[in-house]
From Swiss-Prot:
Family: Belongs to the phosphoglycerate kinase family.
Signal peptide: none
Protein name: Phosphoglycerate kinase
Organism: Herpetosiphon aurantiacus (strain ATCC 23779 / DSM 785 / 114-95)
Annotated residues for binding of ATP: 202, 324, 350-353
Subunit details: Monomer.
Residues where substrate binds: 21-23, 37, 60-63, 119, 152
Amino acid sequence: MNKQTIRDVAWSGKRALVRVDFNVPLDQARKVTDDTRIRAALPTINYLLEQGASVILMSHLGRPKKKVAEEFRLKPVADHLQSLLDAPVNYIQTTTGAEAEAAAQALQAGQVLLLENTRFDPREESNDPAMAEELAKLGDIYVNDAFGAAHRAHASTEGLAKFLPAVAGFLMEAELAALGKALDDPQRPFVTIIGGAKISDKIGVIENLLGKVDSLLIGGGMANTFLLAQNKAVGASLVEADSVAEAGRLIDEAQGRGVKLLLPSDVVVADAFSAEANTQVLSIDDVPDGWRILDIGPETRQTYSQVVSEAKTVIWNGPMGVFELEPFAAGTRAVAQALADSSAITIIGGGDSVAAIEQMGLAEKMSHISTGGGASLELLEGKVLPGIAALNDK
């Protein structure tokens, strides 16, 4: 990565203005139910504190409609962060202006301040330079550690870098190192597994990867559209009629490039979208009318696992079936297990894939678990992410 990081700065006595991604789920009682993203920022926060900086944190939470909404205040996140840090965590109900400036000025080395939800300000999402300039008054150096928001050109992710020296935090650095190395200089065979419901979300990703990978394994609802492009009957399965021609073109392109594009050879079908539905395992040539494909079958699971076992680099994004319903979780679990058993570099992106890995207790077995859904997809598409482009070059 040719961007400056927090290691390139002398922090003693400086105020670090850090964009983190604390967009975490809360329950009815407003308690954090999954703190993965908060924990992911701790190495950066702790390093800055150890180096003698004071730390001012900015994040969004949820999708407030560009105004204050009580249920999206960051107070529960501040409380949770305090339970994970020895340093005192202060929280204020504002993001910019006199109160924020006074709180930032008063902060001592070794202390933390969490600002209010950046998206309460309508100027955040329009990347208004006036908001970025107001935020810049709060710190000396800007640190972007919010990989999950790096694909958005907002005031706190991109605009701010025009007003302060801008460097990457450890999480941002790790994400770029893992995904960047896999895409630019992978150990081969390089295999990508793409799943999830919609092909339309991932056409750009597949397009970009066809120029890089040795094998592409496809599962989830999107596989149905590819199967339809091969004139397979898919019954009442989810398909994107608008994308069938596109899927056919990608199949041809893979062939032309010598990339192995694998689709399910057998599937788990059900007569309804329900955990209580009648199910059967059938060859892809035998899917009856009125039944829907909800998972890859055992033969496909074995084939995909075999390809993974021979790989040196694997990127997995998206589940193989409707993994939240128990009868259709086996495909996703098989892929997760194959990755855990593999000696390859394994990179997991996308919320559902990550959830499957976490649920099975296999997170420790993976080389890298990406915290950014949309951001990692756009990186896989070969796009330049505004939040990263804005950082100072080395």
